[in-house]
Amino acid sequence: METMGRHVISELWGCDFDKLNDMDFIEKTFVNAALKSGAEVREVAFHKFAPQGVSGVVIISESHLTIHSFPEHGYASIDVYTCGDLDPNVAADYIAEALHADTRENIEIPRGMGPVQIKQAQAKVL
């Protein structure tokens, strides 16, 4: 099935509090994840929240990687979207391992498959 991209949404639970709260660690992890998947890094932007948490994005030529971390819950919300031949699971796996996630739930969505076609219901009067 040909797509314009693949989008992995990853729910990470049981992650290390200190890693989820360390902006520099998360930034390096995301850049390395992008590079490991074969992506070309274009822009990097991360923000540290008070009292805890980090959000950020790595823009790649092939799309993006994002995170929103909730250290107090040991939870991270991860998106990895790639176009072309890159496998987003390579980056998502790298990130999950780096954050020491105990539990991981993934959904992979093919992107750019065309508009969703919904057929109109036709009713007959009896």
Curated annotation (Swiss-Prot):
Disruption phenotype: Proteome analysis shows that a mutant overexpresses SAM synthase by comparison to wild-type. It catalyses: S-adenosyl-L-methionine + H(+) = S-adenosyl 3-(methylsulfanyl)propylamine + CO2. GO terms for biological process: spermidine biosynthetic process. The keyword S-adenosyl-L-methionine applies. The keyword Lyase applies. One of its GO terms (cellular component) is cytosol. Transmembrane segments: none annotated. It comes from the Bacteria. Is synthesized initially as an inactive proenzyme. Formation of the active enzyme involves a self-maturation process in which the active site pyruvoyl group is generated from an internal serine residue via an autocatalytic post-translational modification. Two non-identical subunits are generated from the proenzyme in this reaction, and the pyruvate is formed at the N-terminus of the alpha chain, which is derived from the carboxyl end of the proenzyme. This is S-adenosylmethionine decarboxylase proenzyme.
